[in-house]
Amino acid sequence: MVEPQEGKTRFHDFNLAPSLMHAIHDLGFPYCTPIQAQVLGFTLRGQDAIGRAQTGTGKTAAFLISIITQLLQTPPPKERYMGEPRALIIAPTRELVVQIAKDAAALTKYTGLNVMTFVGGMDFDKQLKQLEARFCDILVATPGRLLDFNQRGEVHLDMVEVMVLDEADRMLDMGFIPQVRQIIRQTPHKGERQTLLFSATFTDDVMNLAKQWTVDPAIVEIEPENVASDTVEQHVYAVAGSDKYKLLYNLVAQNNWERVMVFANRKDEVRRIEERLTKDGISAAQMSGDVPQHKRIRTLEGFREGKIRVLVATDVAGRGIHIDGISHVINFTLPEDPDDYVHRIGRTGRAGASGTSISFAGEDDAFALPPIEELLGRKITCEMPPAELLKPVPRKH
């Protein structure tokens, strides 16, 4: 039994099903994160909700707990086809879908509910086989692949009781909204299904979509600044472009860091950094749009298991990565969009753990620092790296 603690909400307090509580206990979650405490208060009553939260706040578990509770409380329809999911989660990237499905599998472990995923870049027939083998309770998918299955008549969305749209702002940016509209038209009307929408930002466009797709939603906002700065110690090193690689190598090698994410702005830069680290004896891998899907999933598993110490990524690939235990994020180049900075450093210091971000500001990217400071609402001290961090990289014989 979890002891009551002032200012904290326990999962016990929501009277969840024992099979779900068993899984929550296994995962070691005694108390809700702020977004979980707020969102579940509304969604467990069946209300629609719009949540503004960055990744790392526990929003995935919030909507999954809500879905699982709804499905356990309501018996499945007597007549249903294999390809008729009862809950649908749409997310913009393959990595995010895989991560949500992994969390869903952990939370449904003792419930008898089935979780399935549809993502592009993976074998269509293999995904079809899982659909034909058993009933689908929770379907997690990217919009394009879901439409493929829907248009071929393999998936029917008329039984969807709960629909979740995750990273809605990102779906807008990536041009997925027309596909999402087509999908939503196949589901029951908005008053007949529960709809939850999550976004890192509440732009006018996002709010317009929310209005169209939800009924009288609860609006929950978790300030991104807290996510960005409270648990992450932020540093900036002023360093010449030609010294950046030396600094990166020495930071990782001298400190024996185990799980580090390095961000760069361009795919060719990501490739170059990864190749040099590997050549210099540090186990590294890259994540960018050029890396095929099966390799991405293998890479993420290797990173999660500690076989890969350094993961080098672009912003698009990096945003879908949600792995606990990343101790350091290094910005090899500062992003031009300040929001990307917040997303990058949000890979560490997740779910209350502490983390460190180190940014390299060189002659080519120091201009990006003031807008980042403006977004954070504070200055980040710019320091010179100590001499031992600029030592030449030892030659491998």
Curated annotation (Swiss-Prot):
It comes from Pseudomonas aeruginosa (strain ATCC 15692 / DSM 22644 / CIP 104116 / JCM 14847 / LMG 12228 / 1C / PRS 101 / PAO1). Its EC number is 3.6.4.13. The keyword ATP-binding applies. A motif (Q motif) lies at residues 9-37. It catalyses: ATP + H2O = ADP + phosphate + H(+). InterPro entries: DEAD/DEAH_box_helicase_dom (IPR011545), DEAD_box_RNA_helicase (IPR050079), Helicase_ATP-bd (IPR014001), Helicase_C-like (IPR001650), P-loop_NTPase (IPR027417), RNA-helicase_DEAD-box_CS (IPR000629), RNA_helicase_ATP-dep_RhlB (IPR023554), RNA_helicase_DEAD_Q_motif (IPR014014). ATP binds at residues 53-60. GO terms for biological process: RNA catabolic process. Keywords: ATP-binding, Cytoplasm, Helicase, Hydrolase, Nucleotide-binding, RNA-binding. Component of the RNA degradosome, which is a multiprotein complex involved in RNA processing and mRNA degradation. Residues 40-220 form the Helicase ATP-binding domain. GO terms for cellular component: cytosol. This is ATP-dependent RNA helicase RhlB. It is found in: Cytoplasm. One of its GO terms (molecular function) is RNA helicase activity. Belongs to the DEAD box helicase family. RhlB subfamily. Residues 243-393 form the Helicase C-terminal domain. Coiled coil: none annotated. DEAD-box RNA helicase involved in RNA degradation. Has RNA-dependent ATPase activity and unwinds double-stranded RNA. The gene is rhlB. A motif (DEAD box) lies at residues 166-169. The keyword Nucleus does not apply. Gene3D superfamilies: P-loop containing nucleotide triphosphate hydrolases (3.40.50.300). SMART domains: DEXDc, HELICc.
